């Protein structure tokens, strides 16, 4: 085990309340190293206020944040902080891994769609009907958030659809890269670290920390990412949200430490 080392897994919600990102910025300042995800050339730094992009995914995220009356992670998290460390694949290595695995973005999307349809068939309520009703609700943003939050409850199941039996570049290979960087940071003497990655990465990440770094879970904390109360729409209050509207932070410490 790595003596006196602690690693927090900070599960990112990419579109959330501005107050959520402000709280994360406060917490992030206390780490020796904060490892973050971004498929980009090694060492890339996100400019303050986020990088502007016309990429279809970026446009989709912008549309979602406007529809839900929320904010975007890259616009508010301070990636210029000195303790931030890029810990993800480069576009070239990401593409190479997908080719070697015989993967494609569309194949992953269809696999995810199949999982979603299977889950819908299990339930009594129609997601399509719920979404239509939410779109015509007098408080559309809040109604949509509540519908979507229910879908996030089975996040691990959704991610297993992406991963497949042999893992995937999107989750498995990127996690391996993040933990490679983690090992380098620990080797350089860092003791208090965090990995800030999408929530879907965390089940696999936690297993690898326990198996490869001999760490063990010690505690968890929830931070409000989406406020699902009625009053949240009027001034975005900081009231506690139901569990499904929160982002989870898990702490792992070296075996034997408190």
Predicted regions and their residues:
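C-terminal soluble interaction/assembly domains
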Residues: 178-186, 190, 194-227
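Compositionally biased, proline/threonine/alanine/serine-rich low-complexity intrinsically disordered stretches
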Residues: 230-258
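Structured, acidic catalytic/metal-binding patches in enzyme active sites
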Residues: 1-173, 184, 218-234
């Amino acid at each position: 085990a790595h003596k006196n080392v602690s690693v927090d897994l900070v599960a990112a919600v990419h579109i959330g309340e501005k107050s959520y990102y402000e709280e994360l910025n406060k917490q992030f300042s206390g780490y020796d190293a904060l490892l973050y995800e971004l498929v980009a050339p090694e060492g890339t730094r996100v400019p303050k206020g986020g990088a502007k992009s016309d990429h279809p995914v970026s446009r989709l995220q912008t549309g979602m944040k406007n529809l839900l009356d929320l904010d975007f992670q890259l616009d508010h998290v301070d990636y210029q902080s000195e303790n931030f460390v890029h810990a993800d694949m480069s576009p070239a290595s990401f593409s190479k891994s997908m080719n070697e695995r015989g993967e494609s973005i569309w194949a992953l999307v269809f696999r995810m769609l199949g999982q979603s349809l299977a889950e819908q068939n299990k339930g009594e309520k129609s997601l399509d009907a719920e979404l239509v009703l939410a779109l015509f609700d007098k408080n559309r943003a809040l109604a949509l958030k509540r519908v979507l939050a229910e879908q996030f409850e089975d996040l691990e199941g959704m991610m297993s659809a992406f991963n497949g039996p042999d893992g995937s570049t999107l989750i498995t290979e990127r996690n391996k890269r993040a933990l490679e960087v983690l090992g380098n940071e620990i080797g350089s003497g860092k003791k208090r670290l965090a990995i800030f990655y999408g929530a879907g990465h965390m089940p696999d990440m936690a297993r690898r920390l326990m198996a490869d770094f001999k760490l063990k879970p010690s505690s968890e904390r929830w931070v409000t990412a989406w406020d699902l109360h009625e009053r949240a729409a009027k001034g975005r209050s900081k009231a506690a949200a139901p569990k499904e509207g929160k982002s989870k932070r898990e702490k792992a410490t070296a075996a034997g430490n408190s």
